[in-house]
Amino acid sequence: PLASLCTIGGPSRADLVAISNDETGISEDPDIRSSVAKKIVERAEDYGITRADIIVDPLVMPIGAINTAGRQVMHIVKRLREELQVNTTCGASNVSFGLPNRHGLNAAFLAMTIGAGLTSAITNPLHPEMMLAVLGAKIMMGHDLNCRRWVQKYREPQAANGAAREGRRSGRRRRAVP
């Protein structure tokens, strides 16, 4: 089955999204899931797919059913980024399945997995808690130079508008601080 997927598309092939389970199912052991991902990556490379074109989903399990599910995913994501140098994704809301205040748990999980090296997520990007988690994680990881996106998103509109009016009245322009 993997061979047929790796040959689809010819020279303009699409990225390969791989899930880290095999014919035995989803293991609770992060080492086994990492090993499965490694096999998939190596096999895909045999077909000419570069690691930059491979996205691995470590498979997020519900934390309410498996209390180590969050820690397992973060461990796997870190290994995938450091050892295999592949991009990662996950269904972020799977972690909170069956629990109250899912958005809060999902946001905490997403920020922590970004810290572990997650490069993309299947989630609701319009939910305020998720947006806050992603923007905050980008700052903490050094991906938001001078916190510009954060400030732009969360600056009080009245303060920003007042400062702009004052600058126009006095003829001053805002200058970037080196």
Q: Over which residues does each language-model region extend?
A:
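Catalytic alpha/beta core domains of metabolic enzymes, predominantly
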Residues: 3-4, 11-165
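Terminal or standalone catalytic/regulatory effector modules within metabolic enzymes
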Residues: 163-178
